Amino acid sequence: MNKKLIILGSGGYGRTVHDIAEQLGYSITVLDDTDKEHPLASFERYIDDDTEFIPAFGNNEFRLQWIHRIEEAGGKLATLVHPTAYVSPKAQVSTGCVILPGSIVNTGSKVGKGCIINLGATVDHDVVIEDGVHLCVRCIVKGENRISHFEKI
């Protein structure tokens, strides 16, 4: 069965998420308020056992609000890891995260819900990244650090 993904948002980040999801073999539907046939508010009609959701908004707080809304409605969140990214088997990545090309999440690190680990970002060992964080392009987080929720670095 084909994996189904609902992407919420069609801006720059939404298009980036779409590219990654295609490479991972998802069948994709995009919801956005600019599309009268597929507005964001229609997300509940897509909830089923075979469908995952990813809110693709650059605004950290708005993205996490949508994560909570999807969970409260009974939807499942995806976690997307680009094939060229490295996530240690001893790291933990929560739901709703997107790990973009060339990124590294090293051993013992924990990534909270709804985080963006952008192109080429490096998360060294034993880092704690709280919910809703965006690590920007080529960001480096040294080992044993903590990044507070909603931070953009």
Placement of each model-derived feature along the sequence:
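Hydrophobic, well-ordered beta-alpha structural blocks that scaffold small-molecule cofactor pockets
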Residues: 1-46
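Generic non-transmembrane alpha-helix signal with a bias for helix starts/N-cap capping motifs
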Residues: 14, 63, 126-127
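Phosphate-bearing ligand-interacting subdomains
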Residues: 18, 35-86
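Short, glycine/charged-enriched secondary-structure capping and boundary segments
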Residues: 21-22, 67-70, 94, 112-113
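Residue-level detector of anion-binding/catalytic polar loops
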Residues: 27, 76, 122
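Structural signal for interior beta-strand "rungs" in well-ordered beta-sheet cores
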Residues: 80-153
